[in-house]
Amino acid sequence: QGNNWLNPKILEVNIPDLKYKYHLKIETCIVINNAYLVDFEFPCFEGENFLSEEIMYIYLSKKGYFCPQNRKIYCFDYLEDGLTSNIFKLWRKNFKGTIFSLENSYMYVMSFPNIFDRWWSAIKIKMNIQALKMTTLGVIPTLKSEEAGWKILLGFSYLWKVARFKKSE
């Protein structure tokens, strides 16, 4: 999509799909009826104060879809010390919640019927998990026997670690 938005024929979408299925790197404004969030409990991790909102979006994907609108609602400038600019620093400071969030994202994308969307997204998520563990724990992550196939990514995850977490160290 040359205009960095969804095909107009797509009338409903789940928020995580914008990133994982449609590969859009965009900011969104999301309007949610509170009734859909009554049962949602945002997970808390002791000593941590940040968790990606993607957890909530994955929860909402089980409730229904959003109707995408391609219109400008607000204009903004990123703050130099804001969330987006410091995301990898936040990931390091909030390790348990970030791993929880990434693992939930992994489970979400593994349900995709399209093998390309599923594996491309899964690889990026696993590399983020491995890179975060290398950075935060200072060790090469051990993998469970059922995850042995992901060992092939460890070298790439190290490069990912250097590129993504260098500023946060």
Regions found by a protein language model. Give the residues of each.
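Short intrinsically disordered, low-complexity coil segments enriched in acidic
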Residues: 1-11, 149, 154-158
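Conserved nucleotide-sugar donor-binding catalytic segment
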Residues: 2-85
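Catalytic core of nucleotide-sugar-dependent glycosyltransferases
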Residues: 72-79, 86-112
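Solenoid-like repeat scaffolds
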Residues: 79, 110-115, 143-152
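Short leucine-rich amphipathic alpha-helical surface patches
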Residues: 102, 106-109, 127-137
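Amphipathic alpha-helical repeat scaffolds of TPR domains
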Residues: 119-129
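Membrane-interface aromatic/basic loop that binds lipid-linked glycans or pyrophosphate carriers
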Residues: 131-169
